[in-house]
Structure formats: C-alpha cells, structure tokens
Amino acid sequence: MRLPVKIAIGCAIGLVVIIVFGFIAFPKMIKGKVKSMINLNKGSEIRQMFVKVPFALDFKIYMFNVTNPMDVQKGALPVLKEVGPFCFEEWKEKVDLDDNDDEDVMFYNPKDTFYKANGPGCLDGSQMITMAHPLILGMVNTVVRTKPGAISLISKAINSIYGNPDSIFMTASAMDILFDGVVIKCGVKDFAGKAVCSQLKEAPDLRHVDENDLAFSFIGPKNATPGKRFKVLRGVKESHDVGRILEYDNKKEMEVWPTKECNQYKGTDGTVFPPYLTKEEGLASYAPDLCRSLVAVYSGDTKYDGIPVRIYTATLGDMSKNADEKCYCPTPDTCLKKGMMDLFKCAGVPVYVSLPHFYESDESYVKGVVGLNPNKKDHGIQILFESTTGGPVKAAKRLQFNMPLEPNPKLPIFANLPNTVLPLFWVEEGVALNNTFTKPLKDLFKIMKIVKIAKWLIMLGCLGGLGAAGYLYFSKKGEANITPVHKVKPAENGVSTLGGEVNHAMSDNEIEKY
C-alpha cells in the first residue's frame, strides 16, 4: 500500500475518533456525570450542603433614621439618613427531614439562625433610630382597610397603650428594633386598650415579656425558628427537577392571589438549582415572605475566580403595566406603581416591599422622601451563576421594607401626615464562594479546556494529514513512466547485418539452405 493512502486512512480514522469522542462522547459523559451528582438523594454531597450550608451567609441590615419627625407630623416630606450596616452571620439549615423514595421527594422545615458579626464598617447596634412606630402605623392602616368604622376605637387604644403620643414616631436602639424587642405596655384597664392588647397577645410574632407586656422586633421572632414545611423533588429520577417545590405548608398552591397562575409555586427555595439551565429559563425561586416566586433573568456573562459564569438580575416588576402581575394589585382597580409590592394579602400587615432606596421603582417613590440615592451596584439584586453544575458562586439578594403614610383626619397624630411611602430598613443577604468551594469547579473547567484544545489540535492535525496525503497521491499520479534506451552491439553468432543493421530474420542454418 502506497504511503499517501496509509496516511489518509490513518488520519481519517483519527478524525472520526476525535469527532465521536471529543465532540459527542466526552461532553455527554461530563453532562451525565454532573447530572448524576446534582441530586438530593440521601448521602449525596449536594444534599449535605443543601441540608446544612457549610458556611455563613453575610447578612447586613441598613436602617433609615427620620431626622425631622415633627416636621413630618405637619406634612413635610421625611428626611432620611441611612444608618448601617448592622452585620450578622446567617446560618441556614433544614430540620425534621423526611423522604419518600417512590415519589423521589423530601420534606423539611427551613431554619435560619443569626449571630452578630464584626467587620469593617459594621455598627454595634446601640445607635438610636427614629422611625414610624410599626405597630401604631400598622394598626391604623389595617383598620382603615378592613374595619374603617373601628377607627375611633383604635385611636383610643393608641392613646391608652402609648400614653397619648404626640406623633407616630418612636426612638429606640437598632438592636431593640431588629432583634431584642421594643416593649409594648399592655397592662391597661380601659376597654379600647384591653381589646387591642388581647389581639396583640395572640400575635405569633410578638414576644411575651411578662404577664402584661409584649415586645416587638422585626427579625427576632424568626431567629432560629423553623419555618413552614416544604415538599420538594430530589432530582434522582430527573435532574432538571432537583429542588423544585411541590408543596409549601402542606398546600400544593397558595390561596393568596386571585388567579391560579400567581398562586403556583415556581422554582426552588433558592439554595439549589438544576444543572444545565438555559439562559431563557432564568432562575426561579419561591419567597415565602412575599408569597411569590421571583425569576432572575439572564443579563450577561463574566468570570468569577477564573470560572465562566452568567449574570442574573431580578426586580419586583410593574403590576401597573404587566398583565401577568396584575394579580398582585391590592384591589382589581388599585395597583401600586413600578417596583413596589403590597404584602397585606400575604402577611396580614400593611407592609410594602421594594428594592433598596426604591431602585428600579417609579420615580414618584424616590421623590416622596428626601435622602435616597438608588444605584445598581449597591441596591440591585445580582446573582453570578455557574450553569454547568447549577450553583450560584456569588449573590447579593436585597429587599427593602416600607410602610405607607396617609393622612387621616379622624386621628389627631395622622391628620396632617404626607401621602407617601416611608422606608423603614433594607437587608442584604450575600454569599461569595471562596477557593475551597470554587476549586472543584476550576478543576472541572480545566479538564474541559484541555480536552477542548486537544480535540481541535488533533482534528486540525488529521485534516492537515488528509491534505498532505492527497497532495502526495495526486503528485505521484501525474508523473510519466520513461523506459531507458541502451545501445545494441552486433551479435557474434553469425547473424548478418545489412546496411549496418542486425538482420534478426535469418540464422546461419537458414542461409545454407540456399
């Protein structure tokens, strides 16, 4: 077999092998291996991290101090000064675990525990904060919505419990407001005060200080307290379903919003996502505090610690314009403007949520107070997501809690209030994986990069070999075969020559015949 043919056959075989293995088999092998690893089956590494996150999340709180409370009582816009951060470690775990292998599901209750943390710029919590009293404002706004005829009773109760206050504002330390509790004096004897206090004593989020007094805080009741029960798919049978919520609080869908679509649980609880999500799918996660699933959308690509990742961002949408979000409107005829959501139907309290500093919200909210400076870097929601394994490598989830201010002539301390939305505080839940957790990802991508480079080099080599073999083959085929000419001497065996040429026609015996 000629050399060019041998080269061509060898290169063709090599080309087929590299196409089959490098471009088809190896990617499928990696994909299959990753899918087999990303599940919540008992004993899996992912489940261990899902059940108890092996590191603390950075939890920061920023509070808004109202610097002109008495002016606000007269109708002026609130002037705000941001105070913070107040820093905490947040440890996440799941408790009371149970599994159903036939359904490929697991059950759990989430539990978040907060510990005070120190760090650059972190405040100790002793700072005094002036803000609208959440209970006074909350009680009045709730009664106005649900039982407006009882407003005079509430007015008397406020005077009784809070000692005839001259404003809706209170001043307390940051730690008392956030965790330790602001005391509510419920040892009153009048009918209105006792009626309201009897309701407050049944509220699960208020701490009983003693027989009469209660204490209110924003985050204290949730600290180290198991939440309601989840039922999620483990992803053993189908990796694309890993972590997907099937039930929450023993319900297959919510009973909060007016449409079936908005009452659906979409996505996971935010601590695990399926591998190989497409950009178009987004990152869907259910937030129990909002009674809503939020979907972070793809917005670009970048690198984190050398790992290629996607950038996802999220907002609260615009219920006033988006048809799919009309279900979140407080009433069919009343929708909040862009970037704002009312939690009254969800939590039973008139609290509005937005992004910090009203970022990505209607401009009227920003102009309704003084002192805000919304910007993407500090106030947006951003997730850096590694799509192969389905893991966030860096994230900043931010949310601001607000309460509406509305004038009400039936209550003296509400009579001249401005009509605006007042920010109370905002939180940031952050995570950034260190080298301990990114190294396995970097090793995986290093192997994939080496294989990618090698397969292209081998393929180019094979194509080059085929080209060289073809050149050699056709070059040989075009050459002419020339036979060399040798001088012939006369024979010495009696053969005659005529005219100097050898006569091959007659031998000596033939001549003798004549």
From Swiss-Prot:
Glycosylation sites: 65, 434
Domain of life: Eukaryota
Record keywords: Cell membrane, Disulfide bond, Glycoprotein, Membrane, Olfaction, Receptor, Sensory transduction, Transmembrane, Transmembrane helix
Disulfide bond residue pairs: 262-327, 291-346, 329-335
Entry keyword Cell inner membrane: no
Coiled-coil residue spans: none
Topology Extracellular: residue spans: 28-452
Primary site of residence: membrane
GO biological process, one term: sensory perception of smell
Cellular component aspect of the GO annotation: membrane; plasma membrane
Membrane topology reported for the UniProt record: Multi-pass membrane protein
InterPro entries according to UniProt: CD36_fam
Compartments, as annotated in UniProt: Cell membrane
Bilayer-crossing regions: 7-27, 453-473
Pfam (any one): CD36
Topology feature Cytoplasmic, residues: 1-6, 474-514
Keyword Transmembrane among record annotations: yes
GO molecular function: scavenger receptor activity
Protein family (similarity comment): Belongs to the CD36 family.
Primary role: Plays an olfactory role that is not restricted to pheromone sensitivity.
The protein's name: Sensory neuron membrane protein 1
